[in-house]
Amino acid sequence: VVVNILVLHGMNRPGVNESVRENFEQLFNDAQLTYHLAFLEGDTQTLKQVVELLISKGIKHFNIIPILLFPAKHYFEDIPNILKDIKRNYPPMNYIIAEPLGTHQTISNIVKNKIANTLIKNDKVQTVVLLAHGSSTYTEPRQAVQHLAQSCDVFGIPIQTVLLYGAGNYVEHLEKILKQYPQTLIVPLFLRDGYLVQRTKQNIRQQAFAENVTFASAINFVPDLAKVIKDRINELEVLANVCYAS
């Protein structure tokens, strides 16, 4: 038996993880999909707790699906380190980690739909800025966001990228963009319009030249996200059939 574990960032703020859990129940309401949710932050249902509970029930093989758009510290360090620690205490355990969600073509389609829907309502938009979390340590998030921007470059206006952290930081770059393109559409590349997105929007609105900025919504568990996650699970199931055949 191979068990699917969807690993989310989570938060220590009261009620946030419960709200996300409800989002997933709605997302997969009609899908024939068996999975367990685990969180990197929070006191309950942590990745360690979920895996160790399943091991105590006799499960040895796990498909780990990070519900992260782009690869950074959580993907390269936190999730693997937690799993390595568990395996150190329980050597028979095996796991495979899926790719992040942001490289899936459907994510590009979701973002393009958000841009197109805004341009229908506002034909004055001069440029689109994709806003992502980024990383102060890893270059992979910036590369992935730039690749996504290239795939979204179908509207005849410039598609640009800024990050919250690392090279391409929005504090450094956004004012220049807004000065050149006052009518800017900003698309937050986040799974939900949570605390970080709201705080960043507030900071941007206080910047110079930001009076004509338009914000699209974050991905916010649109139905197509279910396809992305199911495809990542299917990819792992193919690998699992090979890896766990013995």
Where do the protein language model's features map onto the residues?
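Active-site-proximal alpha-helix that buttresses catalytic centers in soluble enzyme cores
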Residues: 1-246
